[in-house]
Curated annotation (Swiss-Prot):
This is Putative uncharacterized protein LINC02901. It comes from the Eukaryota. It comes from Homo sapiens.
Length: 202
């Protein structure tokens, strides 16, 4: 994962055109940000960003730079076994690199998402589903339609993944999967946000 993958090679990763999903929807902003492009912190929704690019200061984000830096440091300090707080996912972020193609990578490390708050290694059928919403900040607002988002996922606990069902709002749903490794993802945007859906719980 050290080399950038240009857009024209996005579907040559072994997944094929169906396995390397694209996010194309128009319902993101109205569904998750009905009060405007501001992160909601009320109740269990708590739509806080987890991942921010190094262009944060110049992209006019809805959250201040100090807040974002504090959040990034908080996630960096987490261990893989820790439980996700509230309705958050457990996300460990380190050494993220954004190149000129706006491709976000994790060289020498992985991006872990844990849907189940349990530490035990029970059967995969006993695990709660993992759901995530994906958004892109393109300096004009949060959008999920004009910017294609590509993600490469590798399931750890279960081989089959259900990616981007054809519905609004778009989501990632991984049935009976407790741990997910995001090997690489990129989008034509300054910021990529990965956050839980309202129905998601730890």
């Amino acid at each position: 994962m050290n080399a950038a993958v240009p857009p024209e090679q996005a579907h040559s990763c072994g997944w094929g055109t169906e396995g390397c999903p694209c996010l194309r929807s128009t319902a993101i902003r109205q569904t998750f940000f009905p009060g405007g492009d501001q992160f909601q912190r009320d109740g269990g929704l708590a739509m806080l960003p987890i991942l921010v690019s190094k262009f944060l200061a110049s992209s006019d984000p809805p959250v201040s730079v100090p807040e974002m830096l504090g959040l990034q440091n908080r996630w960096r300090g987490m261990k893989n076994e820790e439980h996700c707080p509230g309705s958050f996912f457990l996300c460990k972020i380190r050494e993220c690199v954004l190149n000129y193609r706006f491709q976000l990578q994790h060289p020498g490390f992985q991006h872990y998402l844990q849907s189940s708050g349990r530490r035990d290694r029970g059967r995969s059928e006993d695990k709660k589903p993992l759901e995530a919403g994906v958004w892109c900040w393109d300096r004009g607002g949060w959008d999920g339609s004009s910017r294609a988002v590509h993600l490469l996922f590798r399931g750890v606990a279960h081989p089959s993944l259900y990616l981007f069902p054809r519905e609004d709002p778009p989501r990632l749903l991984f049935p009976r999967l407790s741990l997910l490794v995001c090997e690489q993802f990129w989008c034509y945007s300054a910021t990529l946000l990965l956050a839980p859906l309202p129905a998601s719980t730890c």
